[in-house]
């Protein structure tokens, strides 16, 4: 991970990015690697709820440092596929370093846009962790995400509660789950569950209906 952080800092210093106030700053990448994150993030339970298993094809949107990407890669195994998408090139470079170092062959990085993750094939599930509050045009983004989901494919959106404290963005940047639900339903997906097991975050699970 230190190599990935060093690479991000080098790239950021050499070629400053255009300012985007809602995006996570690449120079703060190490904050995504908190030593207690497994405890409060509960990645295994999140993946279970989304029915992610051996040979699943999944997308990690706003993948950041790749913290969740590597856990997804280990879960889906060599016959599965993980698309690690981000809209910031330093994040993509950091993930590539990390994946190469770990020898993971089932991860593909994708440089997406604010409104299109550019997923190359239909996926079983999409995971968007701590990234929804950064979306500038969430309905447009979710509409394209929905196109990439298989029928009955699932999207899990995990983000910080407005009253949850803990790590995460400033309170004024956090998004009420009811607003997320309205956005996702406007993109044609159906709410399947609201999960409350996380300490600092909420989890919303949506599904793409069959035609």
Regions picked out by a protein language model, each given a short descriptive name:
Residues 58, 126-127:
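Hydrophobic beta-strand segment of the Class I
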Residues 192-211:
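Core SAM-dependent methyltransferase catalytic element
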């Amino acid at each position: 991970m230190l190599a990935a952080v060093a690479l991000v800092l080098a790239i950021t210093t050499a070629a400053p990015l255009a300012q985007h106030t809602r995006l996570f700053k690449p120079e703060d990448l190490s904050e995504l690697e908190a030593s207690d994150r497994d405890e409060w993030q509960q990645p295994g339970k999140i993946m279970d709820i989304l029915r992610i298993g051996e040979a699943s094809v999944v997308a990690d949107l706003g993948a950041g440092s790749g913290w969740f990407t590597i856990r997804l890669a280990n879960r889906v195994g060599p016959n599965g596929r993980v698309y690690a998408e981000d809209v910031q090139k330093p994040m993509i470079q950091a993930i590539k370093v990390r994946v190469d170092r770990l020898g993971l062959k089932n991860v593909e990085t994708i440089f997406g846009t604010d409104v299109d993750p550019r997923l190359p094939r239909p996926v079983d599930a999409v995971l968007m962790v701590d990234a929804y509050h950064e979306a500038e045009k969430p309905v447009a983004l979710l509409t394209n995400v929905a196109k990439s989901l298989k029928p009955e494919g699932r999207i899990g959106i995990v983000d910080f509660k407005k009253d949850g404290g803990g790590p995460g963005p400033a309170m004024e940047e956090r998004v009420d789950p009811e607003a997320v639900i309205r956005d996702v339903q406007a993109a044609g997906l159906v709410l399947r569950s609201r999960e409350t097991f996380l300490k600092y975050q909420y989890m919303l699970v949506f599904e793409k209906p069959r035609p």
